[in-house]
Regions:
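Short, polar loop motifs at secondary-structure junctions
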Residues: 36-45, 91-99, 198-200
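A conserved donor-nucleotide-binding helix/loop in the catalytic core
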Residues: 57-89, 141, 175-187
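Short loop/helix-cap segments at secondary-structure boundaries that form the rim of catalytic
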Residues: 42-51, 98-105, 206
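Catalytic core and acceptor-binding pocket of nucleotide-sugar-dependent glycosyltransferases
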Residues: 137-221
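Short beta-strand-to-loop element that shapes/binds the nucleotide-sugar donor at the catalytic cleft/hinge
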Residues: 106-134
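A structural signal for short, well-ordered beta-strand segments and their strand-loop junctions
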Residues: 37-38, 86-90, 110, 147, ...
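GT-A fold catalytic core of metal-dependent nucleotide-sugar glycosyltransferases
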Residues: 70-117
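N-terminal anchoring/stem segment of glycosyltransferases
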Residues: 1-68, 76-82, 151, 217-224
Length: 224
């Protein structure tokens, strides 16, 4: 199968790119045909044994870069639709154990490590397209690692890009940006595969969970 791993690495976040790629070379779907799609504003040289597709992407200050991720993916619909499955991974993460075919499914999400299956902090303003009512059943998912079939992922990306743009036109930014919109979408379109927090584990926490993908600790003011 053709697998695309989407990574946004602009401005100071470029420092995390090579370590992530090297870790993915070792641990991410080693039995599949993987292409790394790198969205960046830099001229880069990456060491990898896998295929690379570098897509020039303008950097925007936080939170506009994360809010715009689904728009970026939608703008590259034709290229990304060549893949059978697509996964997005935050660049400031690192694979530390095998991630295999268990993640292959139509709509794949990861339980947020800060909430471990709870409701988390969904968007509470009814004016936002990301709004989740208190009586709606939900589990809170992380925005840092998710994916699915190219058809389902790009369908989601198109819808979320439109919703985020609709919010912005009314001067609304959801509480956790794109992650809030992801969680709203999954209430309406339940995931077909839910990964536990070992697939998005905060660095130096939960060593007992058999960690597979770490969210690296960083000083936000030094990279945003």
């Amino acid at each position: 199968m053709k697998i695309g791993l989407l990574i946004i690495a602009t401005n100071k976040y470029i420092q995390f790119l090579q370590p992530l790629i090297s870790s993915a070379d070792n641990f991410f779907l080693n039995n599949q045909d993987v292409t790394y799609y790198i969205f960046t504003d830099r001229d880069i040289q990456i060491e990898t044994s896998r295929k690379l597709c570098i897509i020039n992407t303008e950097h925007k200050d936080w939170p506009w870069m994360t809010l715009g991720r689904y728009k970026i993916f939608t703008e590259n619909y034709k290229e990304l639709s060549k893949m059978d499955y697509i996964y997005y991974c935050d660049v400031d993460m690192k694979f530390v154990s095998d991630v295999g075919n268990e993640i292959i499914s139509d709509r794949v999400v990861t339980i947020h490590p800060g909430f471990l299956g709870g409701r988390g902090t969904p968007e509470h303003r009814i004016e936002s397209t990301a709004y989740i009512a208190p009586d709606e059943n939900m589990t809170y998912y992380a925005g840092g690692f998710n994916g699915g079939s190219s058809e389902k992922f790009l369908e989601m990306s198109t819808i979320l890009a439109e919703r985020i743009n609709q919010d912005l036109s009314r001067n609304i930014i959801a509480i956790w940006h794109d992650e809030s919109h992801l969680n709203r979408y999954m209430v309406d379109n339940p995931p077909t595969k839910i990964l536990d927090n070992s697939y998005c584990c905060i660095e130096n926490e939960y060593p007992e969970c058999g960690r597979k993908l770490l969210a690296l600790i960083k000083k936000h003011n030094e990279v945003r």
